[in-house]
Every structure is written in structure tokens, then in C-alpha cells.
């Protein structure tokens, strides 16, 4: 079983408009609302793929109830209730652009943070892999993921971390390391304080930096150019075919789902990397975020090329 952690989920609201007019009224006909947050995207893709998945995080108010009530029944919902209201994130789709308005989210108390930590320990009992995705809510310290990873490691669980900024930096500088991190080039550049490109030799060099010591897998997303990965002392380039992209939103989360599934099933390096990339591509072919059409899985799987470099 795989446990997904989404500490700062949201209701994602989509407003499609032919044209966004400023300083006047814009009327929307086709409004969609879905449970949002990177970890919930991971949950839905794992569910589509047929994995047993348990979802947790912090939710509150009517928005939190909406998230719990609108997840597929086959996803085990184990969310921790807080006093604040779960946030709403608005995406305005207009003229080929996407303008986002993101709420910060609720402020958690010390007691609520302690309560979630206790629940997290309990939820580890029957899982093999834990994914941790997205931003931390207000009130949680930057090193909170580090705390969860330490608990998971002590219980012999594999962990996949997908976050950025101070939260990721705190984990890299901490004592407890995740099994996998999945930065993109922009996040890697931010961490290292220098611009990183798709140059394989440069990537090889930086991924051996002491900052990443103790992390078994480092999987760097190159967007439409695939992935550059380091597993222990071996480096891989994953070459993916060109596809028609409907929406790339959530494709990174779908890749995380593939990584988690690969770890849970003890797959070899090539199988794990191939599965992860296929799920990311399948999500990009769908209008709905965090959804994959498994009818296209086998064909894409055969088109992925994993090369040791």
C-alpha cells in the first residue's frame, strides 16, 4: 500500500473564458471544482493505475469536507481535521493562458501539528511507500518534512519527496534522507545557486554534491525532454517521444505516482523510470488533472528509452 501526504490541499476551481476582461464583470458558464493539491493528484493516478492508496493531510471547514467527499471511494481517506478552512485555488483559462490565484491556506496550531504527526505514525503500519508532496501550511516549520521522513525511516518505509524551496533545503541539510527526490531544473538551480541546463556531464557533477549525500534516487525532470536520474552510483537518461499535450498540469505528480508504484513493487531501475515517465505523459494527454487513461499505457511504455550514461 502507498500513503500519500498532502499537507496543504485545496479545492481547485477552473474558470474557462474566451477572453479575460480586467476591471469589469466576467461571466463563467463551465465551472469545475476538484480536490486539489499535488499529493491528491498522486493519489488519483495511483488509483487509476490499480494501486491500493491511502491519502492523508490536513483539511478543515466545508472545503475540507468537499475534498474528502469528492475523492474516489477506492482511495482510503485518512485526513486530519483542523479548525481552519482548506484553501481554494483558482485557475482562469483564457486565450491560451492560465492565470492562477492561490490562497495561502489555514494557519495550523502547535496542537494540530502534533495531532497530525501522531496520526501519521499510526498510518504507517500497513504501507510500503510514503509520498510527500507540495507546500507546507502556515504554522508548520520548514523542517516538518524532515520530521516525517525520520519517522518513516525508523519504521522501514520508503519515501518520495516532491517539494521545493525552504522545505526541500531543510530536508537536504537534515539528518534523515528520503529515498527519492524529484526536482526539476528550475528547482535544482535554486538549490545550487546557479543555472542548470540539460547538459548531462554538468548534471552528473552536481548530483554528486554532498548536498545530496544519502539520497538513493535523484530524478530530475527535463520536461518534454524526459528525465535525468541518479540511482546510487549509476546515471540514466530517459528519452521520451513527442506527444500531443492537452495539459501538462499534474504530470510531475503523475511521475511521482509511477516512482512510488515502482518502489512498492520492487521494480528494477529501468522499469521504475519507464513507468514513471509513462504516467507523466498519460496525464499530459488528459484534460483532467491527476488522471491517466490506461488504454494508452502499453504503447507509450514501449516507446520509452532508458540509457545508462
From Swiss-Prot:
Organism of this sequence: Streptococcus pyogenes serotype M12 (strain MGAS2096)
Which gene is the coding source of this polypeptide chain? lacC
Q: Which UniProt keywords apply?
A: ATP-binding, Kinase, Lactose metabolism, Nucleotide-binding, Transferase
Under the heading PANTHER family, the entry gives: 1-PHOSPHOFRUCTOKINASE, 1-PHOSPHOFRUCTOKINASE-RELATED
> From what superkingdom does this record's organism come?
Bacteria
The molecular function GO annotations come to:
ATP binding; phosphofructokinase activity; tagatose-6-phosphate kinase activity
Q: What is this protein called in UniProt? A: Tagatose-6-phosphate kinase
The record's section on InterPro entries has: Carboh/pur_kinase_PfkB_CS (IPR002173), LacC (IPR005926), PfkB_dom (IPR011611), Ribokinase-like (IPR029056), Tagatose/fructose_Pkinase (IPR017583)
Q: Which reaction equations make up its catalytic activity?
A: D-tagatofuranose 6-phosphate + ATP = D-tagatofuranose 1,6-bisphosphate + ADP + H(+)
Amino acid at each position: 500500500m502507498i500513503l500519500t501526504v498532502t499537507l496543504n490541499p485545496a479545492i481547485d476551481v477552473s474558470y474557462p473564458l474566451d477572453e479575460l476582461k480586467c476591471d469589469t464583470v466576467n461571466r463563467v458558464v463551465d465551472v469545475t471544482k476538484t480536490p486539489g493539491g499535488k499529493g491528491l493528484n498522486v493519489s488519483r493516478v495511483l488509483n487509476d493505475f490499480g494501486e491500493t492508496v491511502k491519502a492523508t493531510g490536513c483539511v478543515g471547514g466545508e472545503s475540507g469536507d468537499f475534498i474528502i467527499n469528492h475523492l474516489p471511494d477506492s482511495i482510503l481517506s485518512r485526513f486530519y481535521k483542523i479548525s481552519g478552512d482548506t484553501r481554494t485555488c483558482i485557475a482562469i483559462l483564457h486565450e491560451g493562458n492560465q492565470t492562477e490565484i492561490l490562497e495561502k491556506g489555514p494557519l495550523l496550531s502547535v496542537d494540530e501539528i502534533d495531532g497530525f504527526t501522531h496520526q501519521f505514525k499510526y498510518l504507517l503500519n500497513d504501507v510500503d511507500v510514503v509520498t510527500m508532496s507540495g507546500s507546507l501550511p502556515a504554522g508548520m516549520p520548514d523542517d516538518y518534512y524532515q520530521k516525517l521522513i525520520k519517522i518513516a525511516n525508523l519504521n522501514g518505509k520508503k519515501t518520495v519527496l516532491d517539494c521545493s524551496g525552504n522545505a526541500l533545503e531543510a530536508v537536504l541539510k537534515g539528518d534523515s534522507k528520503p529515498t527519492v527526490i524529484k526536482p526539476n531544473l528550475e528547482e535544482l538551480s535554486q538549490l545550487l545557486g546557479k543555472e542548470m541546463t540539460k547538459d548531462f556531464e554538468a548534471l552528473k557533477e552536481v548530483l554528486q554534491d554532498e548536498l545530496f549525500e544519502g539520497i538513493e534516487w535523484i530524478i530530475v525532470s527535463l520536461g518534454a525532454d524526459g528525465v535525468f536520474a541518479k540511482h546510487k552510483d549509476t546515471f540514466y537518461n530517459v528519452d521520451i517521444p513527442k506527444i500531443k499535450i492537452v495539459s501538462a498540469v499534474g504530470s510531475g505528480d503523475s511521475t511521482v505516482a509511477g516512482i512510488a508504484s515502482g518502489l512498492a513493487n520492487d521494480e528494477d531501475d529501468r522499469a521504475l523510470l519507464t513507468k514513471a515517465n509513462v504516467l507523466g505523459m498519460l496525464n499530459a494527454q488528459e484534460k483532467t488533472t491527476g488522471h491517466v487513461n490506461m488504454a494508452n499505457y502499453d504503447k507509450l511504455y514501449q516507446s520509452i528509452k532508458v540509457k545508462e550514461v
